[in-house]
C-alpha cells in the first residue's frame, strides 16, 4: 500500500480511530527518541515525522497527520539485549551503578537489569558476581537524570 502523496505526521492521539489509513512503524529504542525526519513504515511507505519536541515515541503510540487521513502506530522493535541477574541484590545495585557511571542505558526490572548487547560491557560484567544471558526483547531503558526528553 505505497502512496505517492507525502505523509507528514504531526501529532499524537489518544485513541485509535475506526476510520482512516493505518500504517505501522517499528523502531528500536534509539529510533524512538528521534521525533523528526524521514522514516520507512513496515510496508515501505515513506513518512516524515514532525512531532513536537520534548517527548519520546512509545510502544503502542498512535500518531496522525494534520488532516487525520493517516495514522501511524508505533511498534517497539525486538533488540539484542543482555539480561543481568545476581543472587545478591547488593551486587546487582553495584552493577547498575557501574553501568550508569559509563552512561550505559539500562532497563530496570524487579530482579534483573537489561542493557544492549556489547562485548565491552560483557567483559566488564565478568568482574562482578552476576549472571548474564543474551536475549531478544523489546527495550525500554530508564530515562536518565540528564535526559533531554
Curated annotation (Swiss-Prot):
UniProt-recorded name of the protein: Urease accessory protein UreE
InterPro entries, alphabetized: UreE (IPR012406), UreE_C_dom (IPR007864), UreE_N (IPR004029), UreE_N_sf (IPR036118)
Gene Ontology annotations of biological process type: protein folding; protein-containing complex assembly; urea metabolic process
SUPFAM superfamilies in the record: Urease metallochaperone UreE, C-terminal domain (SSF69737), Urease metallochaperone UreE, N-terminal domain (SSF69287)
Q: What role is this protein assigned?
A: Involved in urease metallocenter assembly. Binds nickel. Probably functions as a nickel donor during metallocenter assembly.
List, alphabetically, the Pfam families matched: UreE_C, UreE_N
Record-annotated membrane-spanning stretches: none
